[in-house]
Regions:
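Short, Lys/Arg-enriched N-terminal segment that forms or immediately precedes the first helix
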Residues: 2-18
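Glycine-centered, phosphate/nucleic-acid-interacting loop/turn motifs that mediate DNA/RNA or nucleotide
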Residues: 65
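Pre-recognition alpha-helix immediately N-terminal to the DNA-recognition helix
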Residues: 26-31
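Short coil turns linking two alpha-helices in DNA-binding domains
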Residues: 50-55
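A short acidic, leucine-rich amphipathic alpha-helix
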Residues: 42-48, 61
Length: 187
């Protein structure tokens, strides 16, 4: 049995950030958060994927210390490993500034924003056949002059939105939506 997991894991190594680059790995962590602990087969069912497509990614997340083995249980005649995320929340250490870390973080942001672009594009094209417009689609880009307190308040609101979305995520009983947000201090 794995020891009690911490509430927050602060990622501070480039290899950990690189492990998050693919949307599938982000989806795996989100599903693990929803399921608390799951076998590869259970994760595959939750994600609508073949189990074989997940093993490599779970191994990479485990090697980066973002996922850990919780227990091994019997499933018929086979032993089945049950995994869990390494912490309730995984956060990136924003104070880390080594070149390798910043490069890995840049790649992660590019991959995340590219995935968001693919999701919005797919949503737009899915509605181009004459159906009613998708009133849930929303895109906002703002630049503003903010105080440090304003930025902290905005981050707190985004944290609250992320918590709300995570708490209301239920596999199988609602439509799927994508949310992406970024706050960046402009040079």
């Amino acid at each position: 049995m794995a020891p009690r997991k911490p509430r927050i894991l602060h990622i501070s190594e480039p290899r950990q950030v690189r492990a998050l680059r693919t949307p599938l790995r982000q989806d795996i962590l989100q599903a693990m958060s929803l399921l608390e602990a799951a076998s590869v087969k259970e994760l595959a069912t939750a994600l609508g994927r073949a189990p074989a497509s997940l093993y490599y990614h779970i191994h990479e997340l485990e090697n980066a210390g973002l996922v850990r083995k919780r227990t091994v249980r019997r499933s018929g005649t086979k032993a089945e490993t049950v995994y869990e995320s390494a912490a309730e929340q995984i956060r990136i250490d924003r104070a880390k500034r080594t070149k390798g870390f910043v490069d890995a973080l840049t790649d992660l942001h590019k991959a995340t924003l590219s995935q968001a672009t693919r999701e919005v594009t797919a949503a737009l094209h899915a509605r181009s056949g004459g159906d009613a417009p998708d009133n849930s689609l929303m895109l906002v880009r703002l630049s503003a002059r903010l105080s440090g307190a304003d930025v902290k308040a905005a981050r707190r609101m985004l944290d609250e939105l992320a918590a709300f979305i995570s708490e209301h995520d239920r596999v199988g009983n609602r439509e799927a939506f994508s949310f992406t947000a970024a706050i960046a201090k402009l040079p």
